[in-house]
């Protein structure tokens, strides 16, 4: 398969192919322009993969530009987090990190150009009055009484804004377009507003800040962006994007193209709602493993490769749709099934004693991956007292139950065949110990007499067990579309986090955050980067071995 054939196909790439073939562009230059007022989520990952992926495939460039035009909501913490997320996903921006604030001087000059052309004016309506004058989708707006000020007066007032002569909310600069436009975004949009706030890049140099729609298009043009890619909610804004560039003296006029944003089941993407989850302590932070943030997914154990694969599979269209959570989980499950080493851990332990086992114990050899001999093997201690999972034993069971049953046999993974002989219970009737015998001639081989032992269960030697905390993470919400609920907080899944105390094989004491394991027969887990200690490792469940929610949706 050629390089071109291996590339994903979508309407944006078709446009790029046509632009290159026609000579309209000789290279491709994209950008990813997040606002540094929060943490990136899986929806941003789609945009990152699209913009950086296109630049990569077409041997072009992709800028990382922070849209830092609102100093009240932005912070250097978010800047560093976003840079880290982009790099973790496997992408690298062209040249230095850029900021919209790099262009504040040019933006100010372009605003003055619009004033000089009679295309912008200083308005002294209050924000409430501006909203009232703007009209509705069915009613046209009406002109501000300040709309027809002279060029000279507007220049003087804009300078007064710049030098701090107005209080916040007392004046703004607006484009003079058409208050009767069927598109509300074109009804004299605000270009500059006053904010007396220190900026994380420019300090206190400015007290007027440009709006996104004014900044975005000019920044694209100044950077030589060829294809400006936005989500569909900016479709109407394209008219303003083009209006600004058509009416200022700038040599380059990029084109904006819109694609559908990512909507994912069982979560919310709204920054406001995510912030509410954090501030009201429904989750422990932006990197809580239940959050759809990139930092949350990373802490849960998602790999960059699995997120890139997910973004590739869902594709790029103009059609809004909601992606099943199972699609994302399938990508990480496939990745980890292929690449994660195996280990044994018991999540709900019950003691099992092998009464006829002699000696202190022994080491058994286990492959790190059943299908990849190149991943090697490890030595796991075995002894006469082990932990097994409580769900792997029943006193009575039907033929479909392939685990340990009283009076019957089962194989211990990569070890011996055992037979359950009797149990010991506490005063409440709970089983505390299972007593067994073992066949000493069945270490990793079938019984010599040819009898069939069908079930296989995992185990951990009690004498060598590593105590661990296991965090069983699940979907944060109990309904597919929590955003549609009257109160999205009311549909939080009460079992989105279940904490268990269990035991693991001793090799897991060397586990490091960011490296996943398949806990055999349980699922995929990784060491938690926040709560783990040397004395008590904490493992997060990334995803189960199979989609347990499939039946829920049926």
From Swiss-Prot:
Keywords: Aminoacyl-tRNA synthetase, ATP-binding, Cytoplasm, Ligase, Nucleotide-binding, Protein biosynthesis
Main location: cytoplasm
GO biological process: glutaminyl-tRNA aminoacylation; glutamyl-tRNA aminoacylation
GO cellular component, one term: cytosol
Quaternary structure (record): Monomer.
NCBIfam families in the cross-refs: glnS, PRK14703.1
Name of protein: Glutamine--tRNA ligase
Organism: Escherichia coli O7:K1 (strain IAI39 / ExPEC)
Gene that specifies this protein: glnS
């Amino acid at each position: 398969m050629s390089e071109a054939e291996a590339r994903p196909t979508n309407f944006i790439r078709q446009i790029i192919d046509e632009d290159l073939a026609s000579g309209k562009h000789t290279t491709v230059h994209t950008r990813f322009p997040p606002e540094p007022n929060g943490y990136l989520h899986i929806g941003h990952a789609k945009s990152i993969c699209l913009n950086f992926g296109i630049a990569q495939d077409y041997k072009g460039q992709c800028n990382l530009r922070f849209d830092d035009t609102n100093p009240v909501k932005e912070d250097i913490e978010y800047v560093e987090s976003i840079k880290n997320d982009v790099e973790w996903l496997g992408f690298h921006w062209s040249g230095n990190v850029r900021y919209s604030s790099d262009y504040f001087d040019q933006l100010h000059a372009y605003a003055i150009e619009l004033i000089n052309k009679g295309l912008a004016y200083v308005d002294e309506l209050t924000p409430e009055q501006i909203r009232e004058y703007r009209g509705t989708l069915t009613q046209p707006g009406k002109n501000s009484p300040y709309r027809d000020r002279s060029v000279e007066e507007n220049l003087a007032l804009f300078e007064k804004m710049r030098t701090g002569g107005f209080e916040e909310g007392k004046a703004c600069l607006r484009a003079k377009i058409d208050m009767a436009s069927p598109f509300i975004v074109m009804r004299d949009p605000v270009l500059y507003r006053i904010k007396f706030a220190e900026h994380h890049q420019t300090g206190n140099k400015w007290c007027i800040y440009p709006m996104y729609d004014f900044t975005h298009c000019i920044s694209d043009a100044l950077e030589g962006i060829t294809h400006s890619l936005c989500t569909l909610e900016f479709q109407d804004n394209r008219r303003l994007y083009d209006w600004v560039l058509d009416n200022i003296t700038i040599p380059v006029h990029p084109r904006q193209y819109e694609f559908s944003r990512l909507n994912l089941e069982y979560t919310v993407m709204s920054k406001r709602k995510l912030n509410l989850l954090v501030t009201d302590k429904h989750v422990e932070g932006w990197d809580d493993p239940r959050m759809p943030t990139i930092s949350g997914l990373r802490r849960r154990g998602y790999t960059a490769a699995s997120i890139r694969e997910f973004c590739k599979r869902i594709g790029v269209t103009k059609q809004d749709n909601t992606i099943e959570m199972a699609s994302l989980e399938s990508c990480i499950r496939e990745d980890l099934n292929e690449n994660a080493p195996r280990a044994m851990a018991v999540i709900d332990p019950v003691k099992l004693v092998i009464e006829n086992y002699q000696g202190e114990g022994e080491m058994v050899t286990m492959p790190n991956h059943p299908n990849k001999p190149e991943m090697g093997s490890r030595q796991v201690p075995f002894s006469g007292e082990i932990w097994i999972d409580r769900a792997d034993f029943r006193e009575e069971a039907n033929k479909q139950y392939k685990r340990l049953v009283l009076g019957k046999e089962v194989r211990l993974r990569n070890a011996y065949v055992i037979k359950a002989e009797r149990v010991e219970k506490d005063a409440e009737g709970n089983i505390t110990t299972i007593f067994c015998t073992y066949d000493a001639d069945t270490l990793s081989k079938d019984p010599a007499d040819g009898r069939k032992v069908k079930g296989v269960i995992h185990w951990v030697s009690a004498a060598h067990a590593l105590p661990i905390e296991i965090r069983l993470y699940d979907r944060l919400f109990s309904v597919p579309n929590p955003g549609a609920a009257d109160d999205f907080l009311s549909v939080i899944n009460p079992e989105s986090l279940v904490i268990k105390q269990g035991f693991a094989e001793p090799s897991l004491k060397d586990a490091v955050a960011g490296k996943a394991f398949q806990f055999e027969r349980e699922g995929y887990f990784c060491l938690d980067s926040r709560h783990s200690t040397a004395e008590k490792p904490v493992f997060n469940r990334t995803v189960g071995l199979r989609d347990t929610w499939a039946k829920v949706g049926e």
